[in-house]
């Protein structure tokens, strides 16, 4: 099994929707998947038909001294969700007070990996370098850095470090945009970790969260859903290749 983290090069690049879409695609391919919201924004739940008023989550449980396992939700027989949970306004104002407490989730994720219950654990990681985020990134076997082809992300790719070994995944690529086409050609020449897969702009991606469903469940025939399914297959092949390479060294 593998732990896969998805993190935006900046905020607002569609990381949460992509995480939900990839989780759905992997379970369509027969994988057992746990998707974990690691962002205090607590938005991943909205892609899995969880009530807006639901405040529970692994972080909320740890902060309240409860068992984080009780926060897990079943979506399909092969797809489970672990929301972050809702923070209070006081907790938002003083994140240093709870970062250490939430660090306990690291050992929990390692135990889940060791159990073999899931083929994949997907982490929806927030943008930034908080202590908790750094800890979770260090647990990942693979990391996808999500970027949109714009000047903002172009600058960031040259001035901020990506997680070690991260692959860059382009999201929301617009057909007919001269600027995006120009930047994309530059990236093809300069970004060696660029994935050979892109996710094109698709209205279904925006609509699926409004419908509280993962992309592939909402519109399996959409272009973006087909591209995410291709991404899921790439993840399976890439993970299998890494394990084969590791085994050959022993």
Curated annotation (Swiss-Prot):
MF GO annotations: ATP binding; ATP hydrolysis activity
One matching Pfam family: CBP_BcsQ
A cellular-component GO term for this protein: cytosol
Subcellular location: Cytoplasm
Primary location: cytoplasm
InterPro entries: Cellulose_synthase_operon_BcsQ, P-loop_NTPase, ParA/MinD_ATPase
Record keywords, A-Z: ATP-binding, Cytoplasm, Nucleotide-binding
Binding-site residues for ATP, renumbered to this chain: 9-16
GO BP terms in the entry: negative regulation of cell division
Signal peptide: none
Family note: Belongs to the BcsQ family.
PANTHER family: CELLULOSE BIOSYNTHESIS PROTEIN BCSQ-RELATED, SEPTUM SITE-DETERMINING PROTEIN MIND HOMOLOG, CHLOROPLASTIC-RELATED
Free-text function comment from the UniProt entry: Essential for cellulose biosynthesis. May play a role in subcellular localization of an active cellulose biosynthesis apparatus at the bacterial cell pole.
Name listed for the protein in its UniProt record: Cellulose biosynthesis protein BcsQ
Organism: Salmonella typhi
